[in-house]
Curated annotation (Swiss-Prot):
The lineage of its organism: Bacteria, Pseudomonadati, Pseudomonadota, Gammaproteobacteria, Pasteurellales. The keyword Cell membrane does not apply. Pfam families: Ribosomal_L19. It comes from Mannheimia succiniciproducens (strain KCTC 0769BP / MBEL55E). The gene is rplS. One of its GO terms (cellular component) is cytosolic large ribosomal subunit. Belongs to the bacterial ribosomal protein bL19 family. This is Large ribosomal subunit protein bL19.
């Protein structure tokens, strides 16, 4: 039974996901259904958390929109996600960047990771 579940999960994993780490800035394009219309919506933000659980993996992006912090959790292998692109690589020393929630302005900036 367990092997069947693992095989089904393996088939549903997306293969075209770029490698990213906390602190990186990503642009995620998501399919949004509004009534009868279906369109792509882009969300660009800093990765503040990653949860690696196979098919149930997720990551959290944070951006500041009109002075208000917006966080959105995406399921990594969701069929609603059209594409993920890395815009900028950030140099941080923690896996979870929840401290960015209390910061604003210059103190919320993340240095750019060079070389890698």
């Amino acid at each position: 039974m367990s092997n069947i579940i693992k095989q089904l999960e393996q088939e549903q994993l997306k293969q075209n996901i770029p490698s990213f780490r906390p602190g990186d800035t990503l642009e995620v394009k998501v399919w949004v259904v509004e009534g009868a219309k279906k369109r792509l919506q882009a969300f660009e933000g800093v990765v503040i958390a990653i949860r690696n659980r196979g098919l149930h993996s997720a990551f959290t992006l944070r951006k500041v929109s009109n002075g208000t912090g917006v966080e959105r959790v995406f399921q990594t292998h969701s069929p609603a996600i059209d594409s993920i692109s890395v815009k900028r690589k950030g140099a941080v020393r923690k896996a979870k960047l929840y401290y960015l929630r209390e910061r604003s302005g210059k103190s919320a900036r993340i240095k750019e990771r060079l070389g890698a």
